[in-house]
Amino acid sequence: MRKSFLKRGSTLVAVLCGIALNPFAAGTASAQEVKNATLYGNMSTVTQDMLSRAGGDANNFLHTNGNYAQTRYYPASQINTSNVKNLRPAWIFQTEITESQETTPIVVNGVMYITTSFNHVYALNAATGQQIWHYKHKMGPITTYCCGPNNRGVAVAGDKLFFGTLDAKLVALDAKS
């Protein structure tokens, strides 16, 4: 039972991300929150000040677990104790990977970034789940992994995404492409 649950992880993780992090999931996003989800427009550079204040930013989710303190707190006001029971999946995104998922997504300017097992990174429209781009790191001749072929997610700074690979590389990607 547990194994089959993990095999469906790629879909489940994305659905839960869509519910938990999507500022549009409750269907009551404020006009300001919609306006700030720029997606394909001028993506603001993520500064150290933005990273330091991430816990109070209702438009972005810039850290694994939300902030440097790892609180998992999201300050948006449209989801509250009276309407949380009404949340429904906003979208489902199916990755091409069927292994377990152990990633935490981040959201920057309306774009959700997720990683999967075997060094894949996806950029998704956080409002719709539509894929914007996909990157797959080519690995060397590695045959064993500690603890499975998992990836824990990306970090963001400036206009770059950073992630560690199974073959001990640190990769920097342009967040827009």
Regions of interest found by a model, annotated:
Residues A25, A29-A31:
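Boundary at the C-terminal end of the N-terminal hydrophobic targeting segment
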Residues S10-P23:
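Bacterial N-terminal signal peptides
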Residues F93-I106, H134-A155:
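Extracytoplasmic beta-rich repeat domains
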Residues Q32-T95, Q130-T143:
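Aromatic (tryptophan-biased) beta-strands that constitute blades/sheets of beta-rich domains
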Residues A126-T128, A175-S177:
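Short loop/turn segments that connect beta-strands within beta-propeller blades
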